[in-house]
Amino acid sequence: MALKILERIFGDYSAKVVKRHQRTVALINSLEPEMQKLSDAELAHKTVEFKERIARGETLEQILPEAFAVVREASIRTTGRRPFDVQLIGGIVLHEGNIAEMKTGEGKTLVAAMPLYLNALLGRGCHLVTVNDYLAKVGRDDIGRIYRFLGMSCGLIVHGLTSAQRREAYNCDITYGTNNEFGFDYLRDNMAMHPQDMVHREFFYAIVDEADSILIDEARTPLIISGPSGKPAEMYYTFAKIAERLKRDEDYIVEEKEKRVAPTEEGIAKVEKWLNVDHLYEGENQQLVHYLNNAIKAKELFHRDRDYVVKDGQVIIVDEFTGRLMFGRRWSDGLHQAVEAKEGVKIEEETQTLATITFQNYFRMYKKLAGMTGTALTEEEEFRKIYGLDVIAIPTNKPMIRIDHPDVVYKTVKAKFKAVADDVEERHKRGQPVLVGTVSIEKSEYLSQILTRRGIPHQVLNAKHHEREAEIVAQAGRFGAVTIATNMAGRGTDILLGGNPDFAARQRMRAEGYAPELIVAATDIIPSQDPEVQAAREVYLQYLKEEEAKCAEEAEKVRAVGGLCVIGTERHEARRIDNQLRGRAGRQGDPGESRFYVSLEDDLMRLFGGEMVQNLMNKLGIEDDVPIDSPMVSRAIENAQKKVEARNFDIRKHVLQYDDVMNTQRELIYKQRRQILEGHDTREVVLDAIAATAQSIVEEGVPEDVYFEEWDPSILVALAEDNGIPKGAVNVEDLKAAVEGVRREQEGREKLAKVIEQAAIRAYEEKEARLGAETMRQLERFLLLRTVDEKWMDHLDAMDDLREGVGLRAYGQRDPLIEYKMEAMEMFNNMIRSIQRDMVRNLFIFEVVREPQRPRIMIESGSQGAAPRQPVRAEGKKVGRNDPCPCGSGKKYKFCCGRAANA
């Protein structure tokens, strides 16, 4: 209410921004006739002219109108598309470092071209971040034509590229890629052993496509590079059997809202008896608690065909936001192994973290960050507080005429799905295309069975049928089409009324026996010189023309019956996910409808607010199959969603507070590591380490609780030798002589440390003279990098353990976050001291020998901090020319990324 009053007084912020930018748009439009007169060469030369003007002191803001006008004209000449005025406004919003909320079908891909071109004029590299390899490649190939026409290079970062290919892509003016690949490259750079292995440039400017998905949904998802930990797999099978024997609410408690489980006293007693151990929570047995909790979580919180599927003997995660199968990703902390044990499939080895960063901290490294999405306003506060980004709603090019019907609420799931089937059947008879959104594979298959029994032809799109995703979604707007889809339906593929002529033309070519790779090459944006491909392209263009005529005719029939109808079978936790589903209908001014069917047995209502409504319905004696349409129920649903959104925001904010501590430490370690890698003077680092080691030897050998007169010099000699200082370098006589006549204990300790330090430096200089300065620097660099990596890896594990246990401090009336910060700093300081001591020890012990280097085994992963982690495994196999391209486009490598690699 207060917000509405403020809006009436001060006006809507987005509307003010849009109005302000309309003056710039008018200026861009006034330049259009001038741009149209330029030849291709003259238009392309504008890039050189802009760079010269910037070198003379002009700002990007001064150049913006002309640069946008140039990109608009280049787009017309290369892609045949002219950016609308609202797209120009979106481009300005992105240049200013904001989130542009643009509805589905409004051409976000083209919008990004203008600010990317403008910022790339500075020569510092700009990134366009997408959610998958396919969209990154389509963007690079399609919009990349504009950049190349204007004399700018455009690179692509996808899975399966070599370091050289990645470095080349990053050195381009503009680079398209996925959030995972950008993040992993950053981590890999900070694990590199040679400068030439590093690929990233500076973090200058990035536009994040589907910003809500990457910056909000995956904000708690750490990217993890990990290696084998060597833990046994048998225990997971043992505890899977134990979990099956335990009873819910009697032997353990499940908190579904928090996704937590806790064994009861009765349950613990049973487990101790079955395992024949005395105390489950003491000593070495504590590791068993980890196995037990994971086994119970796997049993109660992770369900087959909802959270994962079992395919070819493997447990494959289903993305909760998109419904896609996440091949190669694994939950960490032993959870994936527990699910594998529950399903009785082969358990893969557990891993240990080598390097990690969350998307929140990765994207906050950019000097300027912007984003595009169809749904962001509901998360406006989070974008502003976490990333410092304002959300600006961009008006649609044509008025939105979609009809959004009020929710229909039923008591039971069964009654709800019957009503959905009735609605689908009635619309199907009229020929109106229907897209039904479900929240899980299980629900989509349940509805499919109902429609099959009624004889309604339909397509099912879920994680089990992901291979045909784009094809099924593209034809969901045909006359009479019925499509059932999980959340994956939507992003990346437009639903055109009357069907998609491009997909229809491809289908005809497949039916006539054209090879799949030939169809891919013939329909590629990049023209081919191959005569066979050119002939196939002629056929494709002919079929495309015919299908366009058919689809246009069918589109009119669909518009006459109301356009695409979107039916949601359940409200999602976040309103924006519901809005994404609604947004599939009514694109670009098309007619359309949407309606949500809800039951009080749905997870959202069951966990977050359906009890009051349930009690009211029971008191009124409302039957299961009688729908409710009441403002009170609608408010209850909206309040439940707001409650969950606020809770999830708090979780992400809480995670960030903890991760900021780790982030500060990460930046310090990576900065020092990079300096070593780039050839900074390692001798100074070693001398500092020797001084620190000498100090720690004295602290250990002459502790403060020992009278100085009672100290034993032989202990210091032994400690010096334990720390790698050559035997005889430190002797008892020198130590005694150093403190002779000293009265103050502190002064005595300082003198002892100086004796040990000088002895170590003499030994160090002798080794340097023997090996030569250059070899010594190489040895130092290698040992420093190796020691830092090993200690950092151990530190990550220790910080994870601290994070898991620190919450219990709240029971002692202590703030867990403050406790975490204090202990984390102490642990970090201990790690630095440990690095210094190990470095000194190894430097004296190691001798230079020529030996082949063993490859490091690495696994890349993404995970969720508060939610279970989801690692991604990286295969090191070389891709053959005729193999399927690893980017997921469906093309052969030689027709896809291989073309860019060999260009």
UniProtKB/Swiss-Prot annotation:
Cofactor note: May bind 1 zinc ion per subunit.
Cofactor(s) the protein requires to work: Zn(2+)
Gene Ontology CC annotations of this record: cell envelope Sec protein transport complex; cytosol; plasma membrane
Gene Ontology molecular functions: ATP binding; metal ion binding; protein-exporting ATPase activity
A Pfam family the protein falls into: SecA_SW
Annotated positions binding Zn(2+): 885, 887, 896-897
Catalysed transformations (reactions): ATP + H2O + cellular proteinSide 1 = ADP + phosphate + cellular proteinSide 2
Keyword annotations of the record: ATP-binding, Cell membrane, Cytoplasm, Membrane, Metal-binding, Nucleotide-binding, Protein transport, Translocase, Translocation, Transport, Zinc
Topology within the bilayer: Peripheral membrane protein
EC number: 7.4.2.8
Stretch list, region Disordered: 861-883
Record: residues binding ATP: 87, 105-109, 494
Gene Ontology annotations of biological process type: intracellular protein transmembrane transport; protein import; protein targeting; protein transport by the Sec complex
Biased composition (Basic and acidic residues): 872-881
Entry-linked InterPro entries: Helicase_ATP-bd, P-loop_NTPase, SEC_C_motif, SecA, SecA_CS, SecA_DEAD, SecA_motor_DEAD, SecA_preprotein_X-link_dom
Location in or out of the cell: Cell membrane; Cytoplasm
UniProt-listed PANTHER family: CHLOROPLAST PROTEIN-TRANSPORTING ATPASE, SECA INNER MEMBRANE COMPONENT OF SEC PROTEIN SECRETION SYSTEM
Family named by the database record: Belongs to the SecA family.
Quaternary structure and partners: Monomer and homodimer. Part of the essential Sec protein translocation apparatus which comprises SecA, SecYEG and auxiliary proteins SecDF. Other proteins may also be involved.
Function: Part of the Sec protein translocase complex. Interacts with the SecYEG preprotein conducting channel. Has a central role in coupling the hydrolysis of ATP to the transfer of proteins into and across the cell membrane, serving as an ATP-driven molecular motor driving the stepwise translocation of polypeptide chains across the membrane.
HAMAP family: SecA
Official protein name in the record: Protein translocase subunit SecA
Name of the coding gene: secA
